[in-house]
A protein has these predicted regions:
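Short, compositionally biased P/S/T/A/G/V-rich stretches that sit at domain boundaries
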Residues: 85-111
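Aromatic-rich peripheral "rim/lid" segments of glycoside hydrolase catalytic domains that contact
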Residues: 258-260, 317-318, 347, 368, ...
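Gram-positive cell-envelope targeting signals
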Residues: 1-79, 83
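Noncatalytic carbohydrate-binding groove/subsite architecture in carbohydrate-active enzymes
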Residues: 229, 335-338, 350-355, 379-520
Length: 607
């Protein structure tokens, strides 16, 4: 205001000076013209009096105006002070800092080579400066490394975004890293949210082929010796499962006819056994040509040549398969390379197309199928969830619409004192909690609802203690095909849905019934199971184990195949072949009397 007043005053003083000069000039001219000195003095005196009078008059009229403007300025200043709210900063405490920032998304921006983490806060946190920082962590880190450098910075705001490079297929790739938003407090980084992973690796995929649609849920665990004999065509198979023990495909080839395949991923070159890969090429290409949707099961078998794949807490035991190693860089890097290699090779038809990938086998059974020293449920579930995320990101970054599944058996909610296994219900809840908190991804469930016990082919006749274990309650101890709806009902709970609000994909990737209790009973059990699965809209496939009896299983009392080892087709063969065809009732009518029903609706719930 003072500057504005000064400019106004200088302007009026200039006018007065010009007036005085003008009068003086007139006077001098008049004196010169009249030739009288007295006249000049008189005019000069009158000019001085006029100037003094103007000055006095101006000051008298100007003073009220100045006072008025000062009053207006003070009023404006007071109004501005009243309307401007002071910035409020919230002090960070141990209680509020863990979830101070709410993360909306952490996603790759297609075609940009970058990812963006979007987040918000209710109020700005107090800290050393006015910035939010994005920091990178390893998958196995449990706390922030204070020596880390921020990879992105943004001024504090209630809604903000942080952007950094994905560094795709580079030594410093961030596809398997997790990220936190932090502030500096007393010179140290303080994380303000749960670690977050990139959730849309499919944005990197060159292959965007749609997931295949099938007319039937019918599938089989295939016998590789029967791929070319026409049996799969005769059976009308729509889905097939095949195992891939990972250590078997790694390492250089010893057979010169099948050269080693070298594959560089994230700056590291890996050797894949050319002969083993050729075998999978053969299987997957034939199945693809037949229009069959393929499910590959990634198994972590132990090999002295590939110790990095075995979790540090799993190296002391003996089991069929072991927990994947997400606790060390070498394990994560190898898993990621395997996932990327397989998904890239089996995506576009040249070597076959695999669209379903299962991570491990019945991983809730810690002692046999996913060995790790006993740990609490949260620790165990986190290690497995991390393995699923590594394969999810590596596979979907190569094949955008591939699906990745967790694998569970039928022990739903047993609450056993034994430490050999964890309940499936508890495992699913914990995996979901961990994954949702750190960046929800679209994992699916590959379930194994075998009869209980496994050799109980006529499961509908169960009684006593066994019957009490199998109920329609969500707290049932065991899930079989009698109560499979318990699983899909559970997955419909709001907290279990995908980020898009969808029910997660479900496949019954392994179940079967032994013919040692009678081939007709085996066929009746299959018919029951198939109709139960087919009536459930959330089940995408039912894969029967198996096409041919396995010697090691028969020795345990489980002859699960459609055919014997000698090649003789069992009674179940024609039932399997025709159950999804017109006139199927002709082949399944026999089962009603065996089960003791007049209509399938008596045992198959309407969904």
């Amino acid at each position: 205001m003072k500057k504005r007043e000064g400019r106004r005053r200088r302007k009026k003083m200039g006018i007065r000076k010009l007036t005085a000069i003008y009068v003086a000039v007139v006077a001098i001219c008049a004196c010169a013209a009249g030739g009288g000195i007295w006249w000049a003095f008189w005019l000069n005196d009158r000019t001085s009096q006029t100037a003094q009078l103007e000055t006095a008059t101006t000051e008298e009229t100007e003073e009220p105006q100045i006072q008025e403007e000062l009053a207006e300025t003070e009023a404006e200043s007071e109004t501005e002070t009243e309307t401007e709210e002071p910035e409020v900063y919230v002090e960070l405490t141990e209680e509020n800092r863990a979830h101070f920032v709410q993360v909306e998304s952490c996603e790759i921006q297609p075609g940009s080579g970058t990812f963006t983490l979007k987040a918000s806060v209710e109020e700005k946190p107090a800290s050393d400066d006015d910035n939010f920082y994005l920091l990178e962590m390893n998958m196995y880190d449990t706390e922030l490394n204070q020596d880390a450098e921020s990879i992105a910075t943004v001024p504090k705001d209630k809604e903000f975004s942080l952007q950094a490079g994905v560094n795709e297929n580079q030594t410093d790739s961030r596809l398997y890293s997790k990220f936190v938003v932090a502030v500096k407090l007393d010179g140290e980084y303080v994380p303000l949210c749960d670690p977050q992973y990139i959730t849309n690796p499919e944005a990197l995929a060159a292959y965007q082929g749609a997931f295949p649609s099938q007319e039937s849920i019918k599938g089989i665990l295939v016998d590789p010796m029967k791929l070319t004999g026409g049996e799969l065509d005769d059976l009308g198979v729509h889905h097939a499962a095949y195992n891939i023990p990972i250590s078997n495909i790694l390492g250089e080839t010893t057979n010169g006819n099948y050269p080693t395949i070298y594959y560089t991923y994230n700056g590291i070159t890996y050797a894949f056994n050319g002969q083993r890969i050729a075998e999978y090429d053969h299987v997957f290409s034939i199945l693809t040509q037949k229009g069959i949707t393929i499910t590959a099961i990634l198994l972590n078998n132990k090999s002295a040549a590939q110790p990095q794949l075995i979790h540090p807490l799993s190296r002391d035991g003996s089991a069929y398969y072991y927990a994947f190693n997400t606790a060390e860089d070498a394990g994560i890097e190898t898993m990621a390379a395997v996932g990327a290699f397989l998904a890239q090779r089996y995506r576009d038809g040249e070597h076959g197309t695999v669209m379903n990938w299962i991570v491990g086998n019945e991983v809730n059974v810690r002692s046999d199928w996913n060995y790790m020293q006993y740990v609490d449920l949260e620790t165990y579930a986190r290690e497995y969830a991390n393995a699923v995320r590594v394969f999810y990101n590596s596979i979907k970054s190569m094949n955008a619409n591939a699906r990745v599944y967790v694998s569970m058996d039928q022990q739903w909610d047993r609450n056993l004192s034994s430490k050999n296994s964890y309940d499936v219900k508890d495992m699913l809840a914990e995996i979901n909690r961990i994954v949702s908190a750190e960046g929800n991804i679209d994992w699916g469930l590959a379930h194994h609802p075998y009869a209980y016990p496994l050799d109980n082919t006529t499961f509908w006749n169960s009684s006593g203690k066994i019957r009490s274990l199998i109920t329609a309650s969500e707290n049932t101890s065991i899930v079989t095909m009698e109560n499979i709806q318990v699983v899909t009902d559970y997955l419909q709970r709001p907290e279990m849905l995908t980020a898009e609000g969808e029910v997660r994909p479900v496949i019954l990737s392994e179940l079967g019934y032994s013919s040692l209790d009678g081939e007709v009973n085996q066929a009746a059990a299959f018919a029951y199971a198939y109709y139960a699965a087919d009536s459930n809209p959330y089940i995408d496939a039912m894969i029967l184990s198996r096409q041919t009896d396995a010697a090691e299983e028969v020795a345990q009392g489980l002859a699960l195949g459609l055919s014997t080892q000698s090649g003789r087709r069992k009674f179940i063969y024609d039932v399997f072949k025709n159950i999804d065809q017109p006139g199927a009732e002709t082949y399944t009518e026999f089962a009603k009397s065996i089960i003791g029903i007049n209509s399938w609706s008596e045992v198959i719930a309407s969904r």
